A protein has these predicted regions:
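Structured catalytic cores of large enzymes
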Residues: 2-6, 23-143
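Active-site-proximal C-terminal subdomain of hydrolase catalytic domains
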Residues: 215, 219-317
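Structural motif
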Residues: 10-15, 50-53, 63, 121-127, ...
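Catalytic cores of nucleophile-dependent amide-cleaving enzymes
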Residues: 66-112, 174, 179-257
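Short beta->alpha junction loops
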Residues: 35-41, 147-155, 246-247
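Loop/turn elements at helix/coil->beta-strand transitions in domains of secreted/extracellular proteins
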Residues: 5-6, 44, 114-119, 143-145, ...
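Short, highly selective alpha-helical patches that border small-molecule cofactor pockets
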Residues: 16-25, 129-137, 226, 230, ...
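Extracellular/periplasmic Venus flytrap/periplasmic-binding protein
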Residues: 126-166
Length: 317
């Protein structure tokens, strides 16, 4: 797999940066140069800061949770001074406990020694989304990527949530979405990941995913919710990073994203930020609709243990 980016800009208050110390240490252990930009008043314009750099590979803004993904960042990618595109991510500071949980999760993913390429294909049980999932599975197979098809026709919600605890590097959902979660699987909400349904056993140890991409409408929107689904996943420790839309999206744009993501993973993209840079469609609306949440350098490699756990997941198809 390709080498990870090596220069990260972290914009945060001193209190937030202190809560992320475990992740900062993990970045530095992975030879990432972490540049800290502290602020105390207004949230800085991260896109402008990135535009002043020539060598920056990624940026993460951590600011107060009263800000929303759709207004605090303009897009998941911005250009630095030399014209190269750089992934920028957002993380809401709601409380130190959730930041500590995120930092521990992202640090764990950073320290994993996974070098296998694998993806969990998730999707709503509707023909157009199942066709996209089948196309992604074919692209993954052609590119030497192990694809696990855990779509709504093949697995129940509770089994899918349990399967995502195997620790694969990447999960990719296609279907309808809402600010509170996925419409597929009879509705998936953030609380389902830590509140198992009565009478259903769940694996005792969950391993976080590298990144979960929701290629659908509004999962990063704050409309009528205190915290969007895309923001909740990293804060709950489900994944080191997530990717979701702040508004409505076009099925054609989401399909282009899906195809691009599978092609980029097959071509060797090793972090979620690198994946998005390689996979981004040419359409400005396809890019500007989405936001990256969490660690922009989250590794996408899967280790052998996680791969074996995923292979044991039972499906109906």
């Amino acid at each position: 797999m390709a080498a990870a980016p090596r220069h990260l800009l972290l914009c945060a208050t001193r209190k937030a940066a202190a809560a992320l110390s475990e992740l900062v240490e993990a970045w530095r252990s992975a030879s990432v140069r972490v540049e800290l930009e502290y602020f105390t008043g207004a949230t800085p314009d991260v896109a402008a800061l990135v535009g002043e750099h020539d060598t920056l590979d990624a940026a993460l803004l951590v600011s107060w949770a009263r800000r929303a993904p759709g207004t605090v960042l303009p897009a998941p990618l911005v250009r630095r001074r030399d014209g190269a595109r750089v992934p920028i991510a957002w993380l809401p500071f709601r409380d130190t406990a959730s930041l500590h949980r995120f930092a521990a999760t992202a640090a764990r993913v950073q320290r994993r020694a996974g070098n296998r390429r694998a993806v969990a294909l998730l999707g709503q049980w509707l023909p157009n989304y199942l066709r996209v999932s089948d196309r992604m599975r074919w692209l993954a197979h052609e590119g030497g990527v192990r694809a696990f098809r855990w779509t709504g026709d093949a697995i129940t919600r509770e089994s899918m949530i349990d399967a995502l605890g195997c620790g694969l590097g990447l999960g990719l959902y296609v279907g309808h979405g809402r600010p509170m979660g996925w419409v597929g699987y009879h509705g998936v909400r953030a609380h389902h990941f830590h509140e198992p349904e009565p009478g259903i056993a769940r694996r005792s140890t969950r391993e976080p995913m590298g990144a979960i991409l929701s290629l659908c409408c509004r999962t990063a929107s704050r409309k009528r919710v205190g915290m969007s689904y895309a923001e909740s996943l990293p804060l709950l420790g489900v994944a080191a990073a997530s990717f979701g839309a702040v508004g409505d999206t076009l099925h054609s744009d989401n399909t282009r994203w899906a195809v691009g993501v599978c092609s980029a993973l097959a071509a060797g993209a090793s972090t979620v930020g690198e994946l998005l840079v390689r996979a981004a469609p040419a359409s400005p609306t396809a890019l500007e609709s989405y936001r990256l949440i969490g660690d922009p350098l989250a590794p996408l490699g899967t280790d052998e243990r996680s791969l074996r756990r995923a292979q044991r997941v039972r499906t109906y198809a």
